[in-house]
């Protein structure tokens, strides 16, 4: 595309969790200059939807969520709804996890987000899912 007198541009309608590569070339009076190096970016993954969170046995929480186009998932659990303190974070490639370190008879909150790795192996995160609550047996 051609952009007159602009140093920035916006590309729309990109798919979630995909890598895109761009090259830029300046034109002046119908004379094309050299192309730039390749710029690479990864779009953020879609927000993950929760399926279920249950505690069927003592000290265990089973948490499942829907699969999205992503490299993996990061999930958190806490005894506080806002996750400001007293929370733990782990990563997984599965859409079903079991948390085995919960305390009996306590209420826990869990959430998850997807991530995609860019070409430099940096994680690009999607939004956190809605927070789900469970009481441990």
Predicted regions mapped to residue ranges:
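Non-catalytic surface loops within mature trypsin-like serine protease
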Residues: 45-46, 67-69, 79-81, 101-103, ...
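Pro/Thr/Ser/Gly-rich low-complexity, intrinsically disordered linker/stalk tracts
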Residues: 16, 31-68, 123-137
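Conserved hydrophobic/aromatic "anchor" residues
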Residues: 20-22, 65, 73, 83, ...
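Long alpha-helical scaffolds
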Residues: 26, 48-51, 70-71, 78, ...
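Recognizes extended acidic, P/S/T-rich segments that occur
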Residues: 1-15, 74-103
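Beta-strand-rich modules
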Residues: 11-30, 102-120
């Amino acid at each position: 595309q051609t952009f007159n007198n602009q140093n920035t541009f916006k590309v729309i309608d990109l798919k979630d969790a995909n890598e895109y590569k761009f090259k830029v070339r300046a034109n002046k009076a119908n004379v094309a200059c050299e192309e730039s190096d390749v710029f690479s970016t990864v779009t953020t993954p879609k927000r993950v939807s929760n399926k279920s969170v249950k505690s069927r046995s003592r000290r265990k929480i089973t948490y499942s969520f829907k699969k999205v186009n992503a490299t993996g998932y990061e999930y958190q659990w806490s005894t506080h709804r806002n996750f400001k303190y007293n929370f733990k974070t782990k990563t997984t490639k599965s859409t079903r996890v079991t948390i085995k370190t919960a305390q009996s008879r306590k209420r826990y909150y869990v959430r998850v987000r997807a991530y995609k790795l860019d070409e430099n192996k940096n994680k690009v995160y999607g939004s956190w899912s809605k927070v789900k609550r469970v009481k441990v047996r």
